[in-house]
């Protein structure tokens, strides 16, 4: 029978109360080893990011848009303005290669740190310094840790702002002529504008946070986020929890886990909606069109085609009596006709130049349509996010896109699914933490676990 050395005391069922497959629960009271597990986990995440970036670089095809190549990381890098030319064309993949290599190097450092803290470092950080204490019931120390985390998040938001304002700028799909990289020189700082997004309706053209449609507001929002993170971090480092917080909150490792999972769930749901609906932060040049965008692109493409064949786009009627090409919205705005009228609230960089004060401008549609707008609409029309997340065939209207699944489906679907499971995890661990704090039984009796009645492997 294989025996474990003292090195693994606290890591098995007999010495920790948790079986080996219970993960980090075995390390609740071993802060040093718990740090090692977290650092190693970070190394795995960074390794995936680097390896996947290099994989996408190795398979990159210049003739195809990113959303046709199944890439999920290069679009993020392109949105930051690296290697992108006018119209969202990828002109240089060297920055992507460098980013991938830097992530691989970073993952090696993190991996070594994880191994060190798991095998060689002190089992509890308190042995090294009280500054790194992780006593879950030490309320003052827990708020210190929260403060440091907020400051790190503030640094991350600040780096985004610096990139936008001082280090090359960001890709802006609203640059005239089809999009381009530009430096954001005048970010929005007005609190009434930025915090006004929080009070918008989530429906129709309002779109709550997801309705942001200019890079000035995006960068300005990150400035405010960074400022709040820095102020909040300093506050939690300087102050001690108020009495109401000491009494009302549960102070335990599992409670902190539940709080974190709840926050991740919220961010997952918001990210899902951003990916699915927003074409400013997630440019369609890299991620493919949104559902409403593909629908409007189809109407626009057929309008241009039939107009060139002699159709009167202003008066033609469809089989239902509605305008075949153009009609009026419930508010009187001129919109595309037919089935796509349900998406009349859509706003896109390729379509907005054709609007006037009362909606789509007939004179502009007759005389001012540019070739790049026609090409983009035709491309978006055939790349609608209509397949399922596990589809391999897409939809039948995609003659030039074999096995195509719109990137927005992958990213929005995965973030929504992960957000849902994080929410379940939040509720599960919150219930366990509250039960433990109340002093009654939680979870399942370990005596009933089948694995405990099984024979040894050897």
From Swiss-Prot:
GO terms for biological process: photosynthetic electron transport in photosystem II. NCBIfam families: psbC. Its main location: membrane. Belongs to the PsbB/PsbC family. PsbC subfamily. PSII is composed of 1 copy each of membrane proteins PsbA, PsbB, PsbC, PsbD, PsbE, PsbF, PsbH, PsbI, PsbJ, PsbK, PsbL, PsbM, PsbT, PsbX, PsbY, PsbZ, Psb30/Ycf12, peripheral proteins PsbO, CyanoQ (PsbQ), PsbU, PsbV and a large number of cofactors. It forms dimeric complexes. Disulfide bonds: none annotated. InterPro entries: PS_antenna-like (IPR000932), PS_II_antenna-like_sf (IPR036001), PSII_PsbC (IPR005869), PSII_PsbC_sf (IPR044900). GO terms for molecular function: chlorophyll binding; electron transporter, transferring electrons within the cyclic electron transport pathway of photosynthesis activity; metal ion binding. [CaMn4O5] cluster binds at residue 352. One of the components of the core complex of photosystem II (PSII). It binds chlorophyll and helps catalyze the primary light-induced photochemical processes of PSII. PSII is a light-driven water:plastoquinone oxidoreductase, using light energy to abstract electrons from H(2)O, generating O(2) and a proton gradient subsequently used for ATP formation. It is found in: Cellular thylakoid membrane. This is Photosystem II CP43 reaction center protein. Pfam families: PSII (PF00421).
